Swiss-Prot record:
Molecular function terms, GO-annotated: glycine binding; glycine dehydrogenase (decarboxylating) activity; pyridoxal phosphate binding
Keywords assigned: Oxidoreductase, Pyridoxal phosphate
Gene Ontology terms describing biological process: glycine decarboxylation via glycine cleavage system
Protein name: Glycine dehydrogenase (decarboxylating)
Annotated function: The glycine cleavage system catalyzes the degradation of glycine. The P protein binds the alpha-amino group of glycine through its pyridoxal phosphate cofactor; CO(2) is released and the remaining methylamine moiety is then transferred to the lipoamide cofactor of the H protein.
CC cofactor: pyridoxal 5'-phosphate
Chemical reaction(s) catalysed: N(6)-[(R)-lipoyl]-L-lysyl-[glycine-cleavage complex H protein] + glycine + H(+) = N(6)-[(R)-S(8)-aminomethyldihydrolipoyl]-L-lysyl-[glycine-cleavage complex H protein] + CO2
Amino acid sequence: MTQTLSQLENSGAFIERHIGPDAAQQQEMLNAVGAQSLNALTGQIVPKDIQLATPPQVGAPATEYAALAELKAIASRNKRFTSYIGMGYTAVQLPPVILRNMLENPGWYTAYTPYQPEVSQGRLEALLNFQQVTLDLTGLDMASASLLDEATAAAEAMAMAKRVSKLKNANRFFVASDVHPQTLDVVRTRAETFGFEVIVDDAQKVLDHQDVFGVLLQQVGTTGEIHDYTALISELKSRKIVVSVAADIMALVLLTAPGKQGADIVFGSAQRFGVPMGYGGPHAAFFAAKDEYKRSMPGRIIGVSKDAAGNTALRMAMQTREQHIRREKANSNICTSQVLLANIASLYAVYHGPVGLKRIANRIHRLTDILAAGLQQKGLKLRHAHYFDTLCVEVADKAGVLARAEAAEINLRSDILNAVGITLDETTTRENVMQLFSVLLGDNHGLDIDTLDKDVAHDSRSIQPAMLRDDEILTHPVFNRYHSETEMMRYMHSLERKDLALNQAMIPLGSCTMKLNAAAEMIPITWSEFAELHPFCPPEQAEGYQQMIAQLADWLVKLTGYDAVCMQPNSGAQGEYAGLLAIRHYHESRNEGHRDICLIPASAHGTNPASAHMAGMQVVVVACDKNGNIDLADLRAKAEQAGDNLSCIMVTYPSTHGVYEETIREVCEVVHQFGGQVYLDGANMNAQVGITSPGFIGADVSHLNLHKTFCIPHGGGGPGMGPIGVKAHLAPFVPGHSVVQIEGMLTRQGAVSAAPFGSASILPISWMYIRMMGAEGLKKASQVAILNANYIASRLQDAFPVLYTGRDGRVAHECILDIRPLKEETGISELDIAKRLIDYGFHAPTMSFPVAGTLMVEPTESESKVELDRFIDAMLAIRAEIDQVKAGVWPLEDNPLVNAPHIQSELVAEWAHPYSREVAVFPAGVADKYWPTVKRLDDVYGDRNLFCSCVPISEYQ
């Protein structure tokens, strides 16, 4: 049969690439669940009153090649000037071996946060290396495995300083006047909700101020001056004031460690260690503190523990500090951080080692000395005598200098009164320095690099002798071994092989949406047009970014039913915080600032109450009924009780129990009736796109997890993006920025992220996804996600009861399997099942959330029926194994479940178990076997014997 050209062109080809089950598989699954079609299934499950009559108009789908060409044309509108702006962002040289083997490798970027350490030892080791780099450079005792960015880390440092302060009545936080402006911006935003007063003054005047609980200093000021704060820190410590220091990671290679000078907390951006600027992110922040404060630290911390065989193994330590356990009492609302970026930085340090890093840092400093000498020789004055890589140059004809810079396609820092700022980096060359001489002095300057190099003293005094590092760094063997590309490639591959990512198997984590991160979506993030822009470059140089962001925002507006989208939050947790701040400021604008009660269902993710607390709200829990739905009577009672103090409700939809609640519109109406706003958590947006929308349901604000629904990969625990969609009345209250005016946003609010558009360089991933799927594909993706979840639920419900269902016994895009009856009957727990799944080659589902003793499964639309059946077969086989325990064939204390996972060495070890080696290690057959490298971890040992730095190589032997 002849096909038309339009049919043969097949613009929707990517839809079939993204969605796992083909048409025949979809029909088989529809038959299995008793539905005639995807539309019929959706019609049964989603409440009629919230179903969209027509899908959002986001255009027709495009092929991978057409979408890439279209985005390339947009990217080409960005102008790549050489940037010397600095302010915490510099150009880098990402080693190609790391680019190819990590950043472009799905074995690294598709993994999940390492909650299951047995399948995460590779990236845990890389993160432990990151912590070791942080410890060596900061001179402190305890380091975290990354925070979202430097400015966020500063806000976390302030919050932590208050938590550990012995000055309980003090309520003021002092910030030195030469911190980066974006850092001050985010600190002020956070301080407002905590009720802290922020004082900004010259650091030497800090002692003039009373009732100060904490101080933030910057070792190398924003205009380049190196400060020796040793005496000041000593005086502050004598007054029991907690001292935080912002530091430059490359400068720390040469400068004395702030921890050695007495600082309590040290943080900064690790961007300079190989991570492109990317118009603001994503980048990992480093964060370190004294050992005595470890239980008050924010973010993930990797610790050394033992496995069941007594072997050294790594895990996330001290999780009881975190939001998923402590909820509103958590140290921070941080969930995902920046694991992929932290690992790039850690491997940059491994590849270069201490010798290589010192060479890079010394070369940057040498070029800065040469530039300084030439400028001074020609009569220009430097504002600071002590510097590392940044000069603040006083110029008489500033306009002329900036005009010459623009003509030469150079960006200088221009916001300093009567001066310009110049920050050099590892990409700076001799030719660049000569070009800078021409810009600042004119073409006839007569200077010569070689002559200046000879003239400049080799014992340069531009770094104070007292500020030069006198201790060794990175002495651990891991930083002194892998310096050839062959060794580095093999080391990275050895780490990758230890982990389980989407390139090996389905990751059925409920509430996490581990869907395909297509290669075509990932390709643009490494394009130089996107990767090399400074976030504070003039807007006319970022027209491509602005067009791409505006187009993506327009699509998200249509998909969410909101009126505006703010792209600044660079994680879901930060999106929650930004959305709640918008609600808070909206109430204040109406003289209703007293509204501070946030209603949160008992089933909510721990980030919700933690974010509400950070936004200065009181959390009141709303009960759920026996079916897992919000108890409307209790909601009405709590709303009535809150009265004029009701600020909002935070609700997830579909619910965290995996069902479309029939009364969601009524929930919104009750809250609105009492003057509150509705925050609809976008964590489960993958079951809404094209079918319904938060705005249509009646919500006022949501964050969107672009790293879930819109295909940004999880990266082993970050990056993420959490933009917020808002109704028009909240649009004036979304985050703004003190350095860059965000076009189209009338907001005057403070920032929540260091960069105006958060992690802008990963936004092309979501742009590509929406462009290639189109309206038709996006709706179908949601429908197939629902089909896949219902297929699993229907196949497993006789073996593992599905805890919550909606109408007709259906679930949404995920289902909760109740393990509690089996545990009572047999003693086998959800943990045992999770670990046994590793032997079958699967990452575990989400354990004990939102209900203890359960497993929550979310297959996503990207998994084929073949993979779903493989998972189902594994679960049914595990159920048969549990029956063997129940029947007494295997004792409860010695069976394949409680001993799981099994490792390769057990094949040749002594064997005294009542089951065979084959049952232990090959339960699903020998084909394509995944081997964990450690047995089940001893969590208690790890927290009782906390050790969070690199261990001797002998420990792994």
